[in-house]
Amino acid sequence: MTINNRKSHLKDLDPGLMKDWEIAEKAEEFLKPSKMLAEELGLTEDEIIPHGKYVAKVDFAGVLTRLKDRPNGKYIDVTAITPTPLGEGKSTTTMGLVQGLGNLGKKVTGAIRQPSSGPTFNIKGSAAGGGRSQCLPLSPFTLGLTGDIDAVTNSHNLAMVALQARIQHEANNTDEFLSSRSLKRLDIDPARVELKWAIDFCAQSLREIIMGIGGKTDGYQMHSGFGISVSSEVMAILSVFTGLADLRERMSKIIVAYRQNGEPVTTADLEVDGAMTALLLRAVNPNLLQTIEGQPVFVHAGPFANIAIGQSSIVADRLALKLADYHVTESGFGADIGFEKFWNIKCRLSGLKPDCAVIVATVRALKMHGGGPKVTPGAPLDPAYTTPNAALVEKGCQNMLAHIQTVKTAGINPVVCINHFAADTAQEIDIIRRTAEQAGARVAVSYHWANGGEGAAELAEAVIDACNEPNDFHFLYPEDMPLRERIYTIARKVYGADGVSYTQTALEKLARLENTGNTQFMPSCMVKTHLSLSHDPALKGRPGGFTLPIRDILTYMGAGLVVPVAGDIKLMPGTSSDPNFRRIDIDTHTGKVKGLF
């Protein structure tokens, strides 16, 4: 099918009348085979690993070696204002911008994270985008893709298997017996096990469990629990590793527990690190998919931004930047958490420098931040969000200004994308445009949900202009800044906090880290709610006068991250009373999946 024929067909797909999965099903009749997509990118046949006709993995190491002397393309991050619980269309905007740049004749790629089954079957959906700006094929993308998250889950849980077995065998056997198995007693403290089990669902009943209750042959009775797979340190490692040797070294450093004398127990101590790495071998290569309009999209790694690093992989971005003139990557949630981690973690570890950041804003979210009624997933929107209310928008723009300031603090050029909804009025949009421009940002109104790449023309042109303008990219803090000062700097300059407080648990862990000095050069990966600039999801707008409470500090030695946990946020989300799985099914005649979004 020619490009013009494909465009003509896509124009018949009306998001106002069709569900996302219905649009995807029709558009998938005209997908480019992965082989064609790879050829257009400049990949050789031996650099792609097909997974069916429309999904492939790409040998990143081979491509990077072949293209090591090729200059990088322009590097664009898509972030957002603080969202409502419904999301503001950041993934949709990412796909729309990729399509918009492609529509202008640019060689462009995108990169997004693999969706977790947790939100897919719960509330938020698959993060494939929506309307006429989606990542396809939808069902494989949404339902496990090539098994990367399963590999992460299995690798993580193998460490737990090794740890639990070691505790049991040391409890049941003498030193002489252990020695006969070439084992040295590790003397693990069951009360100081750092690791939990992993599962890729939202399962609140598994947050805290008692295990090993059957007897001596059934394990060691102890308190444990589960986190969602995408919060695993193994997933963070998949996001930040730069090559197989780096991956192997990182997998050996994961701290799983502490000994009775306070020394850490690592995956290397359990002799499980090699096997854990082996489980990841097929997951290390990025997955190649495409937009509805046929531009290439790399999908790799899937950590959340509120409870993890919130970025697709470094290797996917490095790969794409060698293949394209413009590469659009996405960081999770708002600029306070997703972009901050892109800025101070991903770019620091990768050595890559962005040219531009797109901040997605909606009239709906700004009304919420201006004092609008509560937005609840599954419940009808209050009329305040579907009828004109310029005053709410004007007041809510304070939240947008905070995110613009964060991007400008990084020294790069912000572009505010007003993601257009049908109920938006010209007056409301003018308020957002005027406020953002006065703050030094470019502004574009984008209709990509309704019109695909053509609807993102203004956005694409604004991004090109921003990328062509010089910038002064720099990090928020030097890598040797003391940990307490680093946490304070993020809290003050990004969140707007007056100060930071610590629980006794956090203070004790902080003191141990400061005494060892092991974390001096490790970036801070903050864990906090995505629903507010603060730690409290109820505080909307641009809150001030608050103290950021750090209740715990986790140490991810393998990923090379210190993880301060702010407020009451959990590493295992819960499933709602009206989850998406109620609406997902198959067509028994065609074998296709219905109800995904």
Curated annotation (Swiss-Prot):
PROSITE patterns: FTHFS_1 (PS00721), FTHFS_2 (PS00722). Signal peptide: none annotated. The keyword Nucleotide-binding applies. GO terms for molecular function: ATP binding; formate-tetrahydrofolate ligase activity. Its EC number is 6.3.4.3. One of its GO terms (biological process) is tetrahydrofolate interconversion. Keywords: ATP-binding, Ligase, Nucleotide-binding, One-carbon metabolism. ATP binds at T84, P85, L86, G87, E88, G89, K90, S91. It catalyses: (6S)-5,6,7,8-tetrahydrofolate + formate + ATP = (6R)-10-formyltetrahydrofolate + ADP + phosphate. Belongs to the formate--tetrahydrofolate ligase family. This is Formate--tetrahydrofolate ligase. It comes from Dehalococcoides mccartyi (strain ATCC BAA-2266 / KCTC 15142 / 195).
